[in-house]
């Protein structure tokens, strides 16, 4: 199973990162004689521009040239952000629109991350694992291979306090919708976590747990294969 950054490494990374407040500015006006800073990315025509820049760089630019502008619309979706979204260019997985995957998360080959899922810094999505809609992998949460994390489920993150152990999900585990796996819990290979369960203690390999707090109710070997099947076709990428 892939291991990634320690809590201390993540904390140092966030502390050292240059905090960013990127904005997108839509402008109409007279742009004659305007000099744009090198940090600006500028697109558009003679009468209309779209500018990508940092909020702190925009202020002096506007003070210098604001009288030449007409309509202005500014979009800002973060403030002093330390962690950008992950560059997915070389990720060999299926990532659907609306998934939020932060830099320093690992997405292994053949994984699937569905709409609305959130993968925080230091988290690991194992090979062939599916993270369903609106599920959350907190900081350093780690899944093995061929895991299914159901819609709305939460694998709690542990960056603060740094001494806490991360959630570990071993291979071939099924986690039902809206289940919650608390900090430090390890779910053993082939286990099944029922929908809505709150897991506060380690789950033995091959066990089925349910309830609040979750308790072992039977063994995965007693569950019909059709109810615990991981479908390879859903992980298939282009040939």
Curated annotation (Swiss-Prot):
Gene Ontology MF: a single term: tetrahydrodipicolinate N-acetyltransferase activity
Q: What is this protein called?
A: 2,3,4,5-tetrahydropyridine-2,6-dicarboxylate N-acetyltransferase
Q: Name one Pfam family in it.
A: Hexapep_2
The record's listing under Gene3D superfamilies reads:
Hexapeptide repeat proteins, Malonyl-CoA ACP transacylase, ACP-binding
Which Gene Ontology BP terms does the record give?
A: diaminopimelate biosynthetic process; lysine biosynthetic process via diaminopimelate
Q: Which UniProt keywords apply?
A: Acyltransferase, Amino-acid biosynthesis, Diaminopimelate biosynthesis, Lysine biosynthesis, Repeat, Transferase
- Upper lineage: Bacteria, Bacillati, Bacillota, Bacilli, Bacillales
**Entry-linked CDD domains:** LbH_THP_succinylT
Q: What is its EC number?
A: 2.3.1.89
What family, per the record? Belongs to the transferase hexapeptide repeat family. DapH subfamily.
- EC class of the enzyme, as a word: transferase
Which pathway does the protein contribute to? Amino-acid biosynthesis; L-lysine biosynthesis via DAP pathway; LL-2,6-diaminopimelate from (S)-tetrahydrodipicolinate (acetylase route): step 1/3
Q: Answer whether the UniProt record assigns the keyword Amino-acid biosynthesis to this protein.
A: yes
Keyword Acyltransferase tagged = yes
Q: Which reaction does it catalyse?
A: (S)-2,3,4,5-tetrahydrodipicolinate + acetyl-CoA + H2O = L-2-acetamido-6-oxoheptanedioate + CoA
């Amino acid at each position: 199973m892939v291991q990634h950054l320690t809590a201390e490494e993540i904390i140092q990374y966030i502390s050292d990162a240059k905090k960013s407040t990127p904005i997108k500015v839509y402008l109409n006006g007279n742009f004659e004689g305007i000099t744009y800073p090198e940090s600006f990315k500028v697109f558009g025509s003679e009468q209309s521009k779209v500018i990508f820049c940092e909020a702190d760089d925009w202020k002096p630019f506007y003070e210098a040239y604001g009288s030449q502008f007409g309509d202005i619309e500014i979009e800002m979706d973060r403030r002093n952000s330390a962690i950008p979204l992950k560059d997915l260019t070389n990720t060999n997985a299926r990532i659907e629109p609306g998934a939020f995957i932060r830099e320093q998360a690992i997405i292994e080959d053949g994984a699937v991350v569905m709409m609305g899922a959130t993968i925080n810094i230091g988290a690991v999505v194992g090979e062939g694992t599916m993270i369903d809609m609106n599920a959350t992998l907190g900081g350093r949460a780690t899944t093995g291979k061929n895991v299914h994390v159901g819609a709305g489920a939460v694998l709690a993150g542990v960056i603060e306090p740094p001494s806490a152990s991360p959630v570990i999900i071993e291979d071939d585990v099924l986690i039902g919708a809206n289940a919650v796996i608390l900090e430090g819990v390890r779910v053993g290979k082939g286990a099944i976590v029922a929908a809505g369960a709150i897991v506060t203690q380690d789950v033995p390999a091959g066990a089925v747990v349910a309830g609040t707090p979750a308790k072992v109710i039977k063994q995965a070997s007693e569950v019909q294969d059709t109810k615990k099947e991981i479908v390879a076709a859903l992980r298939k990428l282009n040939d």
